[in-house]
Regions:
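Extracellular carbohydrate-recognition regions
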Residues: 26-51, 221-223
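Extracellular glycan-recognition surfaces and repeat-rich motifs
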Residues: 41-68, 73-75
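Flexible glycan-contacting loops in extracellular carbohydrate-active proteins
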Residues: 176-208
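Short tryptophan-centered beta-strand motifs in secreted/extracellular beta-sheet-rich domains
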Residues: 37, 91-93, 148-159, 163-169
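Secretory/extracellular carbohydrate-interaction modules
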Residues: 62-64, 68-135, 218
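Short, aromatic/His-centered strand-loop micro-motif at the edge of beta-sheets
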Residues: 131-153
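Beta-strand-rich interaction surfaces with strong enrichment in secreted/lumenal proteins
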Residues: 77-83, 138-144, 184-185, 198-199
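Extracellular beta-strand elements of beta-rich domains used
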Residues: 37, 210-214
């Protein structure tokens, strides 16, 4: 019996270790915020959105509505939404754009307000990156597919004396990655802020955003 007990303990430890690099998304928890744009009038922006900059507006393609950032001017544009949170929160969305020749857009989701953290796909660098403000603090290689919806998940949780950022992306319809793709540990306490979406239309093509969701995540959860 003692041997069986030891085996059970070992199995539990192995399971915890395997879960160590997985996003602790609270998929079953009631969202803190959701927006699919279906109830928003075409040409408008949903009530409660704070447009940092950019001519964002709701567009419709068939039966689907989404928020679109036009392909000009060329700059960085964003929108803040949902409640202001410091940690224990995740943001998810799907984003689509196209390249034009050798010119590529860049886009992503963010947490902790306008100057907080950002999970960004940068096709021109073939990278998935985490930004803190305007500084890239973590990066991993990533091959983006032009014209496909890219699914984003990004979260921040406090674990001990650090705040852990973790993110992953995948093409809609493909299998969601089981593991975190890019992460960053910040020893500096962040400020509370709203979730966000961002776009840089460097390819002069529109960037489209849909299915924005903010959820709570248990603090101290292993990443």
């Amino acid at each position: 019996m003692k041997m069986v007990g030891q085996m059970c303990v070992c199995a539990a430890l192995v399971a915890l270790a395997m879960a160590g690099n997985r996003l602790a998304m609270a998929e079953d928890a009631k969202p803190l915020y959701e927006m699919n744009f279906e109830q928003t009038e075409v040409g408008k922006v949903p009530e409660g959105f704070l447009v940092v900059d950019g001519a964002f507006e709701v567009k419709q393609e068939g039966d689907n509505k989404f928020l679109e950032l036009p392909g000009a001017p060329l700059d960085s544009f964003g929108v803040l939404f949902g409640p202001a949170e410091k940690s224990g929160v995740s943001v998810s969305a799907r984003i689509r754009s196209t390249n034009k020749g050798r010119r590529y857009p860049a886009f992503g989701v963010g947490l902790n307000g306008q100057s907080g953290y950002r999970l960004q796909v940068s096709p021109g660098k073939k990278a998935l990156e985490i930004y803190k403000g305007d500084l890239v603090v973590s990066s991993t290689p990533y091959e983006w597919k032009s014209g496909e919806w890219t699914m984003f998940q990004f979260q921040i949780v406090k674990a001990g004396e650090v705040w852990k950022l973790a993110g992953k992306v995948w093409v809609q319809g493909a299998t969601e990655p089981a593991q975190v793709m890019v992460s960053y540990d910040d020893k500096e306490e962040p400020s509370p802020g709203r979730a966000s979406i961002w776009g840089n239309p460097f390819a002069t093509t529109p960037i489209q955003f849909d299915d924005l969701t903010v959820r709570s995540v248990p603090e101290g959860k292993a990443q």
